[in-house]
C-alpha cells in the first residue's frame, strides 16, 4: 500500500522534500499538455498571462462557468484561493489581477510562497465521480506501481493515514502493464461501470507508456473524474521527471521553472551541486546522497533540524567546497555548519583546503563542525587544526551531530 512507500523514506525528509531532491517538477499546465499529447483527455483550456487574455478567453467560449487556477509548484492552492470557479470575464480579470505576479502561499510551500507567472483557465466538467490515480516508483517493492483510490480529490497521504482500505496498490512488471488480472482488480476495486471500463483500460496503457517513455518518477491525476457523460477526464495532474534522465529528453529541459525554486537551489544547480533548502538551523555539506540523508537523520535523532540537503559529489574540488559553503551561509537561519566527508575518490586534504579558503575569503563567523574520514584524513585534520579558525573537529558522525546540535541550540 502507499503507506509503506512513505514509511520507507528517511525520517529527516517528508515525501515532498524527497521528490524535490531527485526530480524536476512540472506545472499543471505543462503536465496536462503532455497528457493531451498522449491522448489522455483533459479539460479544454488556455494559459493566460494577462487580464486581457483572460477576458478574451472567457468571452470567446460559451461555457457558463470556468475553473481558473494559479500555477505554482505546490499543492493546497484551492485552500489559499488560488483555484476558483468563475462565471464571467470580470471575475477572471479580478482573479488575474489578484494573483498574477504575486506570491501564493499554501500549506505546502515556503513562508513567502511561490510566484504566480501563469494562470490556467479551463472549462468546468459536470462530475459524476472523482477518483485518484497515480504511477510512482515504489522503492520498497522495486517496481513501477499504480496507486488508485475511489476517494479522488483528496490528498493521498491523508487517505493512507485515515482510510487505507480505500487505496489499492498494484506493482507492474517491466514492459507488461496490461496484466488482465491486475486490470480487472483495479476496475472492480474502483467500481467502474461497463461504459467507462474500456476508457480506463486505455488510460492504464497510455499513462504507463507515458511514465516509462518520459522517465517520470511521479504521474498523479487527482482527481481523475468520470463526467455525467461517462467520459474519463484528468481534472488535475502532477508530473515529475527524474532529472538524472534529462540528458535523454532535451525537449524537457526547458520546462524547468526556476522561479519556483529557492534562489540558493538555482545557484547550486549551476555550480554542479545537489542542494535542497529546508527549514532547520544546521547547514549540512556531505559527499554522497545516501551519506547526506543519513547525516540529516542523525541530526534529527540528536534533537536538531537540518537546514538543507547538500551533496557535493565524489569529485569536488577545493573551489566546489568553497562555493558550497558560501551557499550554506547565505541562509540566515543557519547557526552552524556540519561537514561530513568520507574521502574515497575525494581527498580529505582538498576538502580541508576548501573549507579554510571559504572561511577566510567570505569571513564566515558561524562555527563549522567537521568530520573527516578516508583518504589523506590526517593531512586534512592538520590543515584544519593549523588554521586557527572557528572550526571544530569531530571524531565520528555521532560526535559531529551532537556538537552541531548543541551549538544550534545555544548550549
Ranges and model annotations:
Residues 22-220, 225-339, 360, 373-387, ...:
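ATP-dependent carboxylate/acyl-activation modules
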Residues 323-325, 351-356:
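Charged helix-capping and loop-helix junction motifs
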